[in-house]
Amino acid sequence: TVITANQDILPRISSISHLGWYEKHFIPYDEEISIDTKEEAPKLIQSIHDKGTLAEWVKFIEPLFKSSIYLRLVVAACLASVLIEKCSALPFVLHLWGGSGAGKTVALKVAASVWGNPENYTQTINMTPNALMQIAGILHSLPLLGDELQTIKSNIAGQNYDKLIMQLTEG
């Protein structure tokens, strides 16, 4: 084949199937290793990038922090998620509960902005359990930020909701 005949001149690229920690590397911010699951979740993978400066981000969210406990909790959880593996801690789930207009979706979008484009990073949870597990597997160390949790309860008819949460946090 073409690849076999050209092994000496083709560049070798190390790749991995998930984001987050791999040994001492943190994907996608490591230049030595690339992610090879771009086809499974292209919008999600492309959403993870930097834009602007930390100072600009802090200036934008600081007023929101003062007025929303949801925002503070979700951003803290979002930042903590990448420390779980390094601290040998157990994964956790943060479920925001409140009426419409309480700021839950805004909090998710601001937390997603820690990692990149919040519109494409935040997931609708209106998907099959298998699709949700695939997204969680790709994110690995990064947080799974899902909106509209009530939509999944109707999609897992016959399946225990607690079992799904257990699968997400164990796998």
Residue positions per predicted region:
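Conserved glycine-centered beta->alpha loop in an early N-terminal alpha/beta scaffold
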Residues: 1-65, 134, 139, 156
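Residue-identity detector for threonine
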Residues: 1-4, 37, 53, 105, ...
